[in-house]
Amino acid sequence: MALPLSTCLLFHPKESRSRRFCFSPASASLKSGLHSATSAKIASMPTCFEQTRGRIAKLFHKDELSVSTYDTAWVAMVPSPTSLEEPCFPDCLNWLLENQCHDGSWARPHHHPLLKKDVLSSTLACILALKKWGVGEEQIKRGLHFLELNFASATDKCQITPMGFDIIFPAMLDYARGFSLNLRLDPTTFNDLMHKRDVELKRSNRNYSSETETYWAYIAEGMGELQNWESVMKYQRRNGSLFNCPSTTAAAFIALRNSDCLNYLHLALKKFGNAVSAVYPLDIYSQLCTVDNLERLGISQYFSTEIQNVLDETYRCWMQGNEEIFMDASTCALAFRTLRLNGYDVTSDPVTQILQECFSSSFRGNMTDINTTLELYRASELVLYPDERDLEKQNLRLKLLLEQELSSGLIQSCQLGRSINVEVNQAIEYPFYAIMDRVAKRKSIEHYNFDNTRILKTSYCSPNFSNEDFLFLSIEDFNRCQAAHREELGELERWVVENRLDELKFARSKSAYCYFSAAATFFAPELLDARLSWAKNGVLTTVIDDFFDVGGSVEELKNLIQLVELWDVDISTECYSHNVQIIFSALRRTICEIGDKAFKLQGRCITNHIIAIWLDLLNSMMRETEWARDNFVPTIDEYMSNAHVSFALGPIVLPALYLVGPKLSEEMVNHSEYHNLFKLMSTCGRLLNDIHGYERELKDGKLNALSLYIINHGGEVSKEAAIWEMKSWIETQRRELLRLVLEGKKSVLPKPCRELFWHMCSVVHLFYSKGDGFTSQDLIQLVNTIIHQPILLNDQTGAGLSKLHD
């Protein structure tokens, strides 16, 4: 079951301190987008790329929102404040007269065939407005003819039912009867509509709650004499509107002549001219949607200045308690998630309060918006502080709710064409901390729905919600980067051969996996050197780990450490064995190569630091070897102080920090923040490894964190209890790591460097999500999708993009 009315609505009655709920602007999308794309044609269009980029940039400077014939019709019904016999907004009437479709309806251009109920509702509202003021007889006649021909759609269960349709549309039919409009309607359909309205009203009365009151207030124009207008006006906002909805506000003014309602309608018309939109204002949500699209699709780097401006403005509005954010569940959740992920200091209290209201409500009727539920779930994942227990609890409840939706098999989205079941399944199976950045972006591209239609009481759209330009740019960028990544992988594989690492028969060959972990996390072309440093050191740590585990004698291991300590040695005479010679030669050559590249960026020699990083790893591995040889059983603390280093992430991550752009001073790399980030990241990895490798290592007679935890507790703790404790430890370490990565004000390390620690944390979470490290077939498929398989357009989407960009 999705969240109820409260997830879609946040209202603020004047005499109540508790928040209520308002309709979320994210409702329905109508076209299924891309599943796959050819890079050949796209790669040959640099001019088209820039043109597309330019069109997207314009979205930051102008919010484009469609007008609503339904809401405009209700505004047109508003009488003058000085005379009930004259329209207050005659220009709205003229707009209705000029915008009737050829078939007699007042439909949006190119409306979806499943939106016939919306078209019926909009058309009837327009007829009522014209009839009220005695204009447009010909338009009324054509509109009535359209209604009569299409009336059966009003009860068609295959059609999308706009919010409140079953109440509002029958009410408007009653209004039409009062205007003596001669509607020749099928009596069976008409009676079915009226019966359904009566049933819903009776059900709502039986289960009356604050949520019911909220819902009735939102559909005020359809309640007629049943409406308690005093109750409705509790939901009036500071801008004079009811729910930022022109139609509801117009109905309220018609009933009460409230001057603030009228002022709001003037503002809405000032924004759009002679018509209004279905929701106003929607600027913050629209801009956040643009940012979210760009970030999810992996093209935010092309709009960094524009995005920064949106984030700063959103943060300003957040701090001011702007109603546009806090009166809407989706906007609040999206703003919180976007701001927190971009390092802004925002409290989770508003999101928690929304969720507490949701779950405390007994109302499970008219409003079930799975899209808003998913948005709230994503926001609730971002627990950073120990005092955010309430947010953590709500996250677990939301996860359970989404799992129930999936298992029911009845999960539906208000956004037609959106693969909401896929999104929900992915969100549950791969939390944000357990999916690598490029993997998430490819999935977003593959399931992208570029229709931008949403549905509340009527449909509306905006290119800020989604559009083909976002899709086109993301496909081209992904495939272009992927082509470069394939070349880099080829370079890595040549490096393996040139350094004779392929001759080491004891070692696992994992060059593709090592490179994948880099390409799937920091993929920008300019980070080539950082990726290759990461991947080469990943290969070397795998080789050396195997050397310590199975490939080398104690004499060889000691010799390797001694060679690294001495460094400038004659390998032809100082190496204990052929294997040691290959490993040390590759290690020394690679460290020097990385040191030379880093020198160009840093302006100082960092080779000795890389050597020290490697020595830390080698000595920690040697310590574990000696413990095993001597049958020494360390305490869990002794084990972890060494094991977080022996997990071997140091040589992979730390040298790469010098190659991602910012300069790192010696003071920075000696700072406690640097070491804390490394320890948190490595502890997560080590504990995940030890949980998943417990049975195998137990059979091999090896100790790890899980077995030591059980031993240190006298064997009185079960394996399951120990695993639960380990996972809690991982969660604590991961959240602290994320907090340090996101909090920028007090940070010493530059953000691009801090992010590498989080990227590696995501890598290890994904690698251990299904099996023990490099064993999952799913992982093999992921490597192929990120490095080898370009995104291909299906026929329908490809034709749409070709038409758009030819």
Curated annotation (Swiss-Prot):
InterPro entries reported in the protein's UniProt record: Isoprenoid_synthase_dom_sf, Terpene_cyclase_plant_C1, Terpene_synth_N, Terpene_synth_N_sf, Terpene_synthase-like, Terpene_synthase_metal-bd, Terpenoid_cyclase/PrenylTrfase
Function (record text): Catalyzes the conversion of ent-copalyl diphosphate to the gibberellin precursor ent-kaur-16-ene.
Source superkingdom: Eukaryota
CDD domains: Terpene_cyclase_plant_C1
Motif DDXXD motif per UniProt: ranges: 545-549
Note on domains (UniProt): The Asp-Asp-Xaa-Xaa-Asp/Glu (DDXXD/E) motif is important for the catalytic activity, presumably through binding to Mg(2+).
Top EC class for this record: lyase
Record family assignment: Belongs to the terpene synthase family.
Residues at which Mg(2+) 2 binds: 545, 549
Gene name linked to the record: KS
EC number(s) per entry: 4.2.3.19
GO molecular function annotation: ent-kaurene synthase activity; magnesium ion binding
Name of the protein: Ent-kaur-16-ene synthase, chloroplastic
